Amino acid sequence: MFWLLALLAYLLGSLSFAIVLSRLSGSPDPRSCGSGNAGATNMLRLAGRKMAILTLLGDLCKGLLPVMLARLAGLDLQEQAWVGVCAVLGHLFPVYFRFQGGKGVATAAGMLMGLYFPAALLAIAAWLLTFYLTRTSSLAALIATPLTLPLLAWREPAALLPISVLTVMIVWRHRNNLRDLFAGRERHF
C-alpha cells in the first residue's frame, strides 16, 4: 500500500497548478518568465493575485491530500511523511511537464498540515513574518522550512528523517536564490 500511495502522491504532485492556470488564463508560462519558477510567487508576478492564490491553494492541497490518504490507509507517521515527500518530489520534478517544476514550499506546507498541524503553523508564521520584514519570498522559505525540524524532533520524531530530506530538497531548489541573496541580486516585492 505504501508504494502505491507514494506513486499516486508523486503523480498528484506532478500536477503543476502554476502551469495549468497560466495556460487557462492566457498568462505567460511561469517556467520561462519572471523568476522561471512554477510556483505561487512567480504567478503573483506574472498573472496577479487571483491566479497566485489559486496556485497556492492547489499546491497546498497536493501536499495535504496524499498524507491524509496515507493516514486513512493506516500507514504509520513516518510512512505518511515519505508519501508527502513523494508529492513534493512530483512538484519539483513533474513528469507531465518535462520535470521542470517549482520549489516545493507550498506543497511541503500542505504536507506538514497533514502530518503535524502546529509545525505547519510555525512554518507559515515564520514565512509570513520573514516576507513582511524582507519582501523576499526565497529568504522567507529558506528561514521557515528548517524551523520545523526542532518541533518535529520533539513532538513527532518518526517524521524527522523525511522532513530533514524535504528540507534539504527545498534548500537545494533555492540554490540560485541563495547565490543571488549573497550577491545582493535577489528579487523583492
Swiss-Prot record:
The keyword Transferase applies. It is a multi-pass membrane protein. It is found in: Cell inner membrane. The chain crosses the membrane at residues 1-21, 77-97, 111-131, 151-171. Its EC number is 2.3.1.275. GO terms for cellular component: plasma membrane. One of its GO terms (biological process) is phospholipid biosynthetic process. Pathway: Lipid metabolism; phospholipid metabolism. One of its GO terms (molecular function) is acyl-phosphate glycerol-3-phosphate acyltransferase activity. Keywords: Cell inner membrane, Cell membrane, Lipid biosynthesis, Lipid metabolism, Membrane, Phospholipid biosynthesis, Phospholipid metabolism, Transferase, Transmembrane, Transmembrane helix. It holds the Pfam family G3P_acyltransf. It catalyses: an acyl phosphate + sn-glycerol 3-phosphate = a 1-acyl-sn-glycero-3-phosphate + phosphate. InterPro entries: G3P_acylTferase_PlsY. Catalyzes the transfer of an acyl group from acyl-phosphate (acyl-PO(4)) to glycerol-3-phosphate (G3P) to form lysophosphatidic acid (LPA). This enzyme utilizes acyl-phosphate as fatty acyl donor, but not acyl-CoA or acyl-ACP. PANTHER family: GLYCEROL-3-PHOSPHATE ACYLTRANSFERASE-RELATED (PTHR30309:SF0), INNER MEMBRANE PROTEIN YGIH (PTHR30309). Probably interacts with PlsX. Belongs to the PlsY family. This is Glycerol-3-phosphate acyltransferase. It comes from Pseudomonas putida (strain W619).
